[in-house]
């Protein structure tokens, strides 16, 4: 099992959904970065259950404990260990149905790969619960890249087929704060909430699309040919449970354009070389080009649904059916926004360190 990501800014994730805790160890954080637990807690609170509409009934406080690497509200240069304790655990439903593999989950593949020794409760290591550790690491990465002016903004762009109309970048954060689903289009947000309510009443679930924008990236982030900016981002984002697709800029839409329409013309803007369009999503040749980074992430519907589904009983090797009565989200897209942001920040921090743009000691 591979649990680490990054080269200079490296995170190692640990914990399971129904284990004692989830957490992360972060190696390579420069010394002297001002950070306190409240700044990390703010990011973690964005993804926790109960923060948005129709999230899982499992309520966790998600209070952070710092075990190492931060002293007097500054990073020391030592590994940072952050932990959240799991307190609201109910494994009864998973014990009741443990022999029945849940469609859409990693029960079958995890059982086969690890010989049945894996922790199946709540999805174990495959659960979205582990992303709390990603978000803790992302909070530190966000603070680190802010020292060179980079800002990362994520939002719900589509949910259940309802597509948002996007305002200007400067208005996105304000609108998101007024939305129960992290959508900057407030009219679409109300429609999304109603659709989630309908799906919940029907015992079903919904998917959607998260968009993430990176602003003020310097030219030069990315290490071709195998550690390109989009390659590293895609790897990190695909580590988020339920993500089924990632595209940059025009993405798959570029395949339907002619070169004359897809190419982004260059010009001089405020003494800087920029492009007049951004079909490339801020990346050329695997390297940031100074334009806004633009990522779209496809998130599948929550596989845990209350409807009866055909499946297999592993103990008897017979066909059977399953109705899931556990605690689950009707739609995880709004909560996934903070995780996509976190993984983006982590990758940008790592590549900025590798490029020498961020120093090993932060001078205040």
From Swiss-Prot:
It catalyses: 5-O-(1-carboxyvinyl)-3-phosphoshikimate = chorismate + phosphate. Reduced FMN (FMNH(2)). Its cofactor is FMNH2. GO terms for biological process: amino acid biosynthetic process; aromatic amino acid family biosynthetic process; chorismate biosynthetic process. GO terms for cellular component: cytosol. Gene3D superfamilies: Chorismate synthase AroC. Pfam families: Chorismate_synt. Keywords: Amino-acid biosynthesis, Aromatic amino acid biosynthesis, FAD, Flavoprotein, FMN, Lyase, NADP. Pathway: Metabolic intermediate biosynthesis; chorismate biosynthesis; chorismate from D-erythrose 4-phosphate and phosphoenolpyruvate: step 7/7. FMN binds at residues 125-127, 285, 300-304, 327. NADP(+) binds at residue 47. Its EC number is 4.2.3.5. SUPFAM superfamilies: Chorismate synthase, AroC. GO terms for molecular function: chorismate synthase activity; FMN binding. Homotetramer. This reaction introduces a second double bond into the aromatic ring system. Belongs to the chorismate synthase family. This is Chorismate synthase.
């Amino acid at each position: 099992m591979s649990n680490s990501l990054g080269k200079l800014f490296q995170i190692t994730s640990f914990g399971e959904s129904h284990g004692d805790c989830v957490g992360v160890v972060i190696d390579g954080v420069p010394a002297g970065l001002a950070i306190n637990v409240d700044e990390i807690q703010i990011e973690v609170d964005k993804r926790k259950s109960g923060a948005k509409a129709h999230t899982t009934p499992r309520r966790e406080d998600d209070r952070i404990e710092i075990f190492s690497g931060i002293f007097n509200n500054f990073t020391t240069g030592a590994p940072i260990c952050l932990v959240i304790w799991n307190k609201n655990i109910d494994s009864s439903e998973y014990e009741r149905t443990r022999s029945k593999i849940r469609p859409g989950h990693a029960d079958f593949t995890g059982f086969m790969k690890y010989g049945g020794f894996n922790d199946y409760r709540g999805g174990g290591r495959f659960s979205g619960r582990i992303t709390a550790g990603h978000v803790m690491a992302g909070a530190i990465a966000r603070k680190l890249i802010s020292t060179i002016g980079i800002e990362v903004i994520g939002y719900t762009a589509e949910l259940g087929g309802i597509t948002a109309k996007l305002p200007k970048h400067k208005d996105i954060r304000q609108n998101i704060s007024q939305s129960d689903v992290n959508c900057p289009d407030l009219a679409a947000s109300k429609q999304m909430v109603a659709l989630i309510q309908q799906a919940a009443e029907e015992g079903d679930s919904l998917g959607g699309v998260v968009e993430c924008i990176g602003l003020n990236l310097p030219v030069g982030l990315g290490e071709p040919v195998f550690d390109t900016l989009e390659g590293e981002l895609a790897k990190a984002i695909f580590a988020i449970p339920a993500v089924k697709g990632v595209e940059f800029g025009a993405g798959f839409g570029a395949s339907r354009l002619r070169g004359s329409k897809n190419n982004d013309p260059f010009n001089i803007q405020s003494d800087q070389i920029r492009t007049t369009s951004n079909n490339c999503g801020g990346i050329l040749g695997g390297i940031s080009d100074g334009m806004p980074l633009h990522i779209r992430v496809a998130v599948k519907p929550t596989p845990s649904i209350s409807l009866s589904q055909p499946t297999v009983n592993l103990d008897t090797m017979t066909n059977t059916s399953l109705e899931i009565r556990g605690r689950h989200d009707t739609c995880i897209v709004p909560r996934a926004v903070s995780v996509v942001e976190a993984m983006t920040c982590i990758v940008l921090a790592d590549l900025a360190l590798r490029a020498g743009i961020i120093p090993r000691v932060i001078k205040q």
